[in-house]
Amino acid sequence: MTISMFQCLLIGLWTAFCLAGMLFGIYTNRCLVMAAGVGLILGDLPTGLAMGAVGELAFMGFGVSQGGSVPPNPMGPGIVGTIIAITMKDSGIDVGSALALSFPFAVAFQFVITATYTFATTLTSYAYKALDKKNFRGFRIAANATVCVFAVVGFIIGFGGAFSSEGLQKVISLIPA
């Protein structure tokens, strides 16, 4: 299965919405929500829901990080794992295999998210400076910039994952069974 450019854009926008929604506390960053959206966009909702359910089971223990540890990000199985499960279904990749193949992405995405949080902490000083100058428009922009930054990062991850699905299929086919 090939993914059209329009589907890549939709997956990117869906990922942006899901990642930015995490900041609002609306739980759009859960595997089930992300995978269902990708499944709907790619026209295979049952596989999307199955991948989301398996991802939720796998991430059940990752709900709370202990100490300074940060668990892998659910975008791995929620976005990339679902793309793998749907596009490589004809190649014998099932939902369980797609979950296993998506964990390196989950770890990599967590590094990206941590770097994004680190960058976004600098935006707070701009908000304080704008308030000191009574620049309320600047404050609104600085205060909401974190959501915009996360949306852009989410779009890049979603679009990149969907756009590179053919290359990903070639890499996976090189892995010995």
State the predicted function of each range.
Residues 1-71, 75-76:
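Hydrophobic transmembrane alpha-helices
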Residues 95-176:
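Helix-loop-helix junctions within the multi-pass membrane cores of secondary transporters/permeases
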Residues 3-7, 11, 71-93, 132, ...:
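Transmembrane alpha-helical segments and their short flanking loops
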Residues 45, 53-124:
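Hydrophobic, small-residue-rich transmembrane alpha-helices and their short perimembrane loops
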